[in-house]
Protein backbone atom coordinates (compact mmCIF):
# COMPACT_ATOMS: atom_id res chain seq x y z
CA UNK A 1 0.00 0.00 0.00
CA UNK A 2 2.73 2.49 0.94
CA UNK A 3 4.60 1.74 -2.27
CA UNK A 4 1.49 2.37 -4.38
CA UNK A 5 0.87 5.61 -2.53
CA UNK A 6 4.42 6.81 -3.05
CA UNK A 7 4.39 5.93 -6.75
CA UNK A 8 1.08 7.74 -7.27
CA UNK A 9 2.24 10.92 -5.55
CA UNK A 10 5.49 10.92 -7.53
CA UNK A 11 3.46 11.10 -10.75
CA UNK A 12 2.64 14.68 -9.72
CA UNK A 13 5.49 15.73 -7.41
CA UNK A 14 8.91 15.87 -9.05
CA UNK A 15 11.86 15.25 -6.76
CA UNK A 16 11.44 15.63 -2.99
CA UNK A 17 11.58 11.85 -2.64
CA UNK A 18 13.05 12.04 0.86
CA UNK A 19 10.39 14.54 1.94
CA UNK A 20 7.65 12.25 0.62
CA UNK A 21 9.17 9.27 2.40
CA UNK A 22 9.20 11.15 5.71
CA UNK A 23 5.56 12.16 5.26
CA UNK A 24 4.54 8.57 4.51
CA UNK A 25 6.57 7.37 7.48
CA UNK A 26 4.63 9.76 9.69
CA UNK A 27 1.27 8.70 8.23
CA UNK A 28 2.06 4.99 8.71
CA UNK A 29 3.09 5.72 12.30
CA UNK A 30 -0.24 7.46 12.89
CA UNK A 31 1.23 10.88 13.62
CA UNK A 32 0.88 14.47 12.49
CA UNK A 33 3.46 16.12 10.24
CA UNK A 34 4.78 19.69 9.93
CA UNK A 35 6.44 20.78 6.68
CA UNK A 36 8.71 23.80 6.82
CA UNK A 37 10.15 25.67 3.85
CA UNK A 38 10.10 28.93 1.94
CA UNK A 39 7.10 29.70 -0.30
CA UNK A 40 6.91 28.09 -3.71
CA UNK A 41 8.36 24.65 -2.94
CA UNK A 42 5.08 22.73 -3.44
CA UNK A 43 4.45 22.03 0.25
CA UNK A 44 0.72 22.51 -0.17
CA UNK A 45 0.60 20.60 -3.46
CA UNK A 46 2.49 17.69 -1.92
CA UNK A 47 0.03 17.34 0.94
CA UNK A 48 -3.00 17.77 -1.34
CA UNK A 49 -1.65 15.07 -3.66
CA UNK A 50 -1.15 12.64 -0.77
CA UNK A 51 -4.73 13.34 0.34
CA UNK A 52 -6.09 12.85 -3.19
CA UNK A 53 -4.42 9.45 -3.42
CA UNK A 54 -6.25 8.23 -0.32
CA UNK A 55 -9.99 7.59 -0.21
CA UNK A 56 -10.63 9.72 2.89
CA UNK A 57 -12.41 12.95 3.72
CA UNK A 58 -10.05 15.87 3.09
CA UNK A 59 -10.28 19.38 4.50
CA UNK A 60 -8.08 22.42 3.95
CA UNK A 61 -7.75 25.24 6.48
CA UNK A 62 -6.00 28.38 5.26
CA UNK A 63 -4.50 29.98 8.35
CA UNK A 64 -4.71 33.77 8.24
CA UNK A 65 -4.18 36.50 10.86
CA UNK A 66 -7.94 36.90 11.39
CA UNK A 67 -8.76 33.18 11.68
CA UNK A 68 -10.68 32.33 14.87
CA UNK A 69 -10.75 29.01 16.80
CA UNK A 70 -14.42 28.56 15.86
CA UNK A 71 -13.43 28.73 12.19
CA UNK A 72 -11.47 25.51 12.78
CA UNK A 73 -13.47 23.60 15.38
CA UNK A 74 -17.02 24.65 14.60
CA UNK A 75 -19.62 26.74 16.38
CA UNK A 76 -22.98 26.53 18.10
CA UNK A 77 -25.97 28.37 16.64
CA UNK A 78 -29.50 28.92 17.92
CA UNK A 79 -32.18 27.62 15.60
CA UNK A 80 -35.92 28.21 15.89
CA UNK A 81 -38.50 25.69 14.77
CA UNK A 82 -40.84 27.54 12.43
CA UNK A 83 -43.80 25.37 13.49
CA UNK A 84 -43.50 25.30 17.27
CA UNK A 85 -41.38 28.38 17.83
CA UNK A 86 -39.09 26.30 20.01
CA UNK A 87 -35.43 27.27 20.01
CA UNK A 88 -32.53 24.89 20.37
CA UNK A 89 -28.76 24.98 20.08
CA UNK A 90 -27.25 23.14 17.14
CA UNK A 91 -23.56 22.43 16.63
CA UNK A 92 -22.14 23.08 13.17
CA UNK A 93 -18.88 21.11 12.74
CA UNK A 94 -15.82 22.95 11.46
CA UNK A 95 -13.24 21.74 8.93
CA UNK A 96 -11.38 19.81 11.65
CA UNK A 97 -14.08 17.12 11.23
CA UNK A 98 -12.27 15.29 8.45
CA UNK A 99 -9.64 12.57 8.13
CA UNK A 100 -6.79 14.45 6.47
CA UNK A 101 -6.43 18.10 7.47
CA UNK A 102 -4.21 20.47 5.52
CA UNK A 103 -3.31 23.28 7.92
CA UNK A 104 -1.82 25.63 5.35
CA UNK A 105 0.65 28.27 6.57
CA UNK A 106 -0.18 27.44 10.17
CA UNK A 107 2.17 30.08 11.55
CA UNK A 108 0.33 32.92 9.79
CA UNK A 109 -2.28 32.95 12.56
CA UNK A 110 -1.80 33.98 16.22
CA UNK A 111 -1.00 31.35 18.90
CA UNK A 112 -4.55 31.49 20.31
CA UNK A 113 -5.94 30.08 17.08
CA UNK A 114 -3.00 27.70 16.56
CA UNK A 115 -3.73 26.20 19.98
CA UNK A 116 -7.26 25.31 18.88
CA UNK A 117 -5.73 22.19 17.34
CA UNK A 118 -4.16 20.92 20.58
CA UNK A 119 -7.05 18.83 21.89
CA UNK A 120 -7.94 17.58 18.43
CA UNK A 121 -4.42 16.39 17.61
CA UNK A 122 -3.84 14.61 20.92
CA UNK A 123 -7.25 13.36 22.05
CA UNK A 124 -9.11 13.19 18.71
CA UNK A 125 -11.96 15.26 20.08
CA UNK A 126 -12.97 18.91 20.48
CA UNK A 127 -14.87 20.58 23.29
CA UNK A 128 -17.40 23.26 22.35
CA UNK A 129 -19.63 24.84 24.99
CA UNK A 130 -18.63 22.16 27.49
CA UNK A 131 -19.72 19.36 25.14
CA UNK A 132 -17.17 16.92 23.73
CA UNK A 133 -17.41 15.99 20.08
CA UNK A 134 -15.46 12.97 18.83
CA UNK A 135 -13.48 13.40 15.63
CA UNK A 136 -13.34 10.97 12.75
CA UNK A 137 -10.64 8.31 12.60
CA UNK A 138 -8.07 8.17 11.19
CA UNK A 139 -7.06 11.80 11.69
CA UNK A 140 -3.88 13.22 10.20
CA UNK A 141 -2.97 16.90 10.51
CA UNK A 142 -0.46 17.80 7.81
CA UNK A 143 0.63 21.40 8.30
CA UNK A 144 2.87 23.77 6.37
CA UNK A 145 4.75 26.74 7.72
CA UNK A 146 7.05 29.42 6.37
CA UNK A 147 10.36 30.35 8.01
CA UNK A 148 9.73 32.35 11.16
CA UNK A 149 12.00 35.12 9.92
CA UNK A 150 9.43 36.07 7.30
CA UNK A 151 7.04 38.95 7.90
CA UNK A 152 3.63 38.15 9.34
CA UNK A 153 4.50 34.84 11.00
CA UNK A 154 4.02 33.71 14.61
CA UNK A 155 6.08 30.99 16.32
CA UNK A 156 4.14 27.85 17.16
CA UNK A 157 3.77 27.21 20.92
CA UNK A 158 6.02 24.46 22.26
CA UNK A 159 2.98 22.36 23.21
CA UNK A 160 1.71 22.65 19.64
CA UNK A 161 5.07 21.69 18.14
CA UNK A 162 5.28 18.62 20.36
CA UNK A 163 1.99 17.33 18.89
CA UNK A 164 3.69 16.96 15.51
CA UNK A 165 5.45 13.62 15.24
CA UNK A 166 7.79 14.86 12.50
CA UNK A 167 9.07 18.26 11.40
CA UNK A 168 10.08 17.84 7.76
CA UNK A 169 12.28 20.40 6.03
CA UNK A 170 11.71 20.94 2.32
CA UNK A 171 14.48 22.56 0.29
CA UNK A 172 14.94 23.83 -3.25
CA UNK A 173 14.94 21.10 -5.93
CA UNK A 174 18.07 20.14 -7.81
CA UNK A 175 18.69 21.70 -11.23
CA UNK A 176 17.63 18.46 -12.95
CA UNK A 177 14.43 18.18 -10.93
CA UNK A 178 13.61 21.85 -11.46
CA UNK A 179 13.94 21.38 -15.20
CA UNK A 180 11.50 18.47 -15.04
CA UNK A 181 9.14 20.68 -13.01
CA UNK A 182 9.27 23.36 -15.69
CA UNK A 183 8.50 20.82 -18.41
CA UNK A 184 5.63 19.24 -16.49
CA UNK A 185 3.94 22.41 -15.24
CA UNK A 186 4.03 24.29 -18.55
CA UNK A 187 2.52 21.46 -20.58
CA UNK A 188 -1.15 21.24 -21.45
CA UNK A 189 -1.95 18.04 -19.53
CA UNK A 190 -2.02 17.69 -15.76
CA UNK A 191 -1.70 14.16 -14.32
CA UNK A 192 -4.82 12.90 -12.59
CA UNK A 193 -4.29 11.47 -9.14
CA UNK A 194 -5.90 8.08 -8.58
CA UNK A 195 -7.05 6.81 -5.20
CA UNK A 196 -4.80 3.90 -4.34
CA UNK A 197 -5.49 3.48 -0.60
CA UNK A 198 -8.45 3.58 1.76
CA UNK A 199 -8.90 4.59 5.36
CA UNK A 200 -9.00 0.91 6.29
CA UNK A 201 -5.63 0.43 4.56
CA UNK A 202 -4.09 3.21 6.66
CA UNK A 203 -5.63 1.93 9.89
CA UNK A 204 -4.35 -1.59 9.17
CA UNK A 205 -0.89 -0.24 8.36
CA UNK A 206 -0.88 1.79 11.55
CA UNK A 207 -1.84 -1.27 13.59
CA UNK A 208 0.85 -3.31 11.84
CA UNK A 209 3.50 -0.70 12.65
CA UNK A 210 2.61 -0.84 16.33
CA UNK A 211 2.68 -4.64 16.30
CA UNK A 212 6.19 -4.82 14.84
CA UNK A 213 8.67 -6.08 17.45
CA UNK A 214 11.62 -3.90 18.44
CA UNK A 215 14.79 -5.31 19.96
CA UNK A 216 15.83 -4.12 23.40
CA UNK A 217 18.90 -2.35 22.03
CA UNK A 218 16.74 -0.37 19.56
CA UNK A 219 14.37 0.71 22.35
CA UNK A 220 17.31 1.64 24.58
CA UNK A 221 18.89 3.62 21.74
CA UNK A 222 15.71 5.64 21.12
CA UNK A 223 15.43 6.31 24.84
CA UNK A 224 19.07 7.33 25.09
CA UNK A 225 18.80 9.74 22.16
CA UNK A 226 15.70 11.45 23.56
CA UNK A 227 17.16 11.82 27.05
CA UNK A 228 20.49 13.09 25.71
CA UNK A 229 18.74 16.23 24.41
CA UNK A 230 17.85 17.32 27.96
CA UNK A 231 20.53 19.55 29.53
CA UNK A 232 19.55 18.52 33.07
CA UNK A 233 20.00 14.81 32.36
CA UNK A 234 23.22 13.35 33.82
CA UNK A 235 23.92 11.59 30.51
CA UNK A 236 23.63 14.79 28.46
CA UNK A 237 26.92 15.69 26.71
CA UNK A 238 28.63 19.00 27.43
CA UNK A 239 27.52 20.69 24.20
CA UNK A 240 23.88 19.95 25.05
CA UNK A 241 24.22 21.42 28.54
CA UNK A 242 25.80 24.51 26.98
CA UNK A 243 23.56 25.05 23.95
CA UNK A 244 20.14 23.58 24.79
CA UNK A 245 17.57 25.28 27.02
CA UNK A 246 14.90 22.57 26.85
CA UNK A 247 15.18 19.10 25.43
CA UNK A 248 12.71 16.61 24.03
CA UNK A 249 10.02 15.07 26.22
CA UNK A 250 8.75 11.47 26.39
CA UNK A 251 6.77 11.91 23.15
CA UNK A 252 10.10 12.10 21.32
CA UNK A 253 11.07 8.58 22.37
CA UNK A 254 7.66 7.28 21.31
CA UNK A 255 7.99 9.05 17.96
CA UNK A 256 11.52 7.73 17.40
CA UNK A 257 10.42 4.15 17.95
CA UNK A 258 7.17 4.35 15.97
CA UNK A 259 8.70 6.10 12.96
CA UNK A 260 11.67 3.72 13.02
CA UNK A 261 9.18 0.84 12.76
CA UNK A 262 7.34 2.62 9.93
CA UNK A 263 10.62 3.29 8.13
CA UNK A 264 11.52 -0.39 8.33
CA UNK A 265 8.09 -1.33 6.98
CA UNK A 266 8.55 1.05 4.03
CA UNK A 267 11.72 -0.88 3.18
CA UNK A 268 9.91 -4.21 3.41
CA UNK A 269 11.40 -5.19 6.77
CA UNK A 270 9.51 -6.27 9.87
CA UNK A 271 12.17 -5.45 12.45
CA UNK A 272 13.51 -1.89 12.96
CA UNK A 273 17.24 -1.37 13.32
CA UNK A 274 19.46 1.27 14.89
CA UNK A 275 19.88 2.79 11.43
CA UNK A 276 16.12 3.27 11.22
CA UNK A 277 16.21 5.27 14.46
CA UNK A 278 19.12 7.35 13.16
CA UNK A 279 17.27 8.01 9.89
CA UNK A 280 14.29 9.58 11.65
CA UNK A 281 16.19 11.32 14.47
CA UNK A 282 16.43 14.74 12.81
CA UNK A 283 12.74 15.17 11.83
CA UNK A 284 11.64 13.78 15.20
CA UNK A 285 13.93 15.92 17.37
CA UNK A 286 14.59 19.20 15.53
CA UNK A 287 11.37 20.89 16.67
CA UNK A 288 11.62 19.53 20.20
CA UNK A 289 15.04 21.00 20.98
CA UNK A 290 14.92 24.62 22.17
CA UNK A 291 18.29 26.35 21.99
CA UNK A 292 19.63 28.96 24.38
CA UNK A 293 19.81 32.57 23.24
CA UNK A 294 23.60 32.36 23.07
CA UNK A 295 23.51 29.22 20.91
CA UNK A 296 21.13 30.90 18.48
CA UNK A 297 23.37 33.98 18.40
CA UNK A 298 26.32 31.71 17.57
CA UNK A 299 24.41 30.30 14.60
CA UNK A 300 23.87 26.84 16.08
CA UNK A 301 20.80 24.97 14.81
CA UNK A 302 18.80 22.10 16.33
CA UNK A 303 19.90 19.91 13.40
CA UNK A 304 23.53 20.45 14.37
CA UNK A 305 22.72 19.36 17.92
CA UNK A 306 21.04 16.19 16.62
CA UNK A 307 23.99 15.47 14.31
CA UNK A 308 26.42 15.74 17.22
CA UNK A 309 24.24 13.45 19.32
CA UNK A 310 24.22 10.83 16.57
CA UNK A 311 28.00 11.00 16.32
CA UNK A 312 28.32 10.34 20.03
CA UNK A 313 25.76 7.56 20.17
What annotation goes with each model-predicted range?
Residues 79-84, 109-113, 121-211, 261-263:
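Canonical AAA+ ATPase core
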Residues 38, 72, 144:
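P-loop (Walker A) phosphate-binding loop of NTP-binding proteins
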Residues 37, 104-105, 116:
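Walker B catalytic acidic pair
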Residues 33, 101, 139:
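Conserved beta-strand position immediately N-terminal to the Walker
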Residues 1-41:
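Pre-Walker A (pre-P-loop) alpha-helix and adjacent loop at the N terminus of AAA/AAA+ ATPase modules
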Residues 27-65:
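Walker A/P-loop
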Residues 22-25, 79-102:
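Conserved alpha-helical scaffold flanking the Walker A/P-loop in AAA+ ATPase domains
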Amino acid sequence: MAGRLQDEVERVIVGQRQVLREILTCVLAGGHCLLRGVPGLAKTLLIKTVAQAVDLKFSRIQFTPDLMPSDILGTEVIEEDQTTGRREIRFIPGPIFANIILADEINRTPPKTQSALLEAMQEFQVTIGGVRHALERPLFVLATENPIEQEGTHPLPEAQLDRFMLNVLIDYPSAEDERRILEATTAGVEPEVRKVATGADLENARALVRDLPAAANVIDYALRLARATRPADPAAPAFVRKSVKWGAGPRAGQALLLTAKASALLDGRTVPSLDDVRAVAAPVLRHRVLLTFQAEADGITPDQVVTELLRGN
